Curated annotation (Swiss-Prot):
Belongs to the papillomaviridae E4 protein family. This is Protein E4. Contributes to multiple aspects of the viral life cycle including viral genome amplification, suppression of suprabasal cell differentiation and egress of newly formed virions. Induces host cell cycle arrest at the G2 phase by associating with and preventing the nuclear entry of host CDK1/cyclin B1 complexes. Inhibits cellular DNA replication by preventing loading of host replication licensing proteins MCM2 and MCM7 onto chromatin. Within the cytoplasm, associates with host kinase SRPK1, a splicing factor regulator, and inhibits its activity. Residues 49-58 have a biased composition (Polar residues). The gene is E4. Residues 22-33 have a biased composition (Pro residues).
Length: 91
């Protein structure tokens, strides 16, 4: 019965006893607010400016080089025995 449109006075005949009774209009359900669409674009490393910096001026046992972009940080180091270490962090 809920799916069919049946006049309220047919379902509840006592409402006919009230003078000037009118079926109230159906309320409009509130709309859910929409989240703003995000602009997304995959950035390539070649599109970005990169910044390269050297290790501090003080001598260290294992000097390193840091290369940064908008989405990555790369640290390169070479130990005294010649072992090369590269660590890249992608954000």
């Amino acid at each position: 019965m809920a799916n069919r449109e049946v006049p309220v006075t047919d379902r509840y005949p006592l409402l006919n006893l009230l003078p000037n009774y009118q079926t109230p209009p159906r309320p409009i359900p509130p709309q859910q607010p929409h989240a703003p669409k995000k602009q997304s674009r995959r950035r390539l490393e070649s599109d970005l400016d990169s910044v390269q910096s050297q290790s501090p001026l003080s001598p260290t046992e294992c000097p390193w080089t840091i290369l940064t972009t908008h989405s990555t940080v790369t640290v390169q180091a070479t130990t005294q025995d010649g072992t090369s270490v590269v660590v890249t962090l992608r954000l």
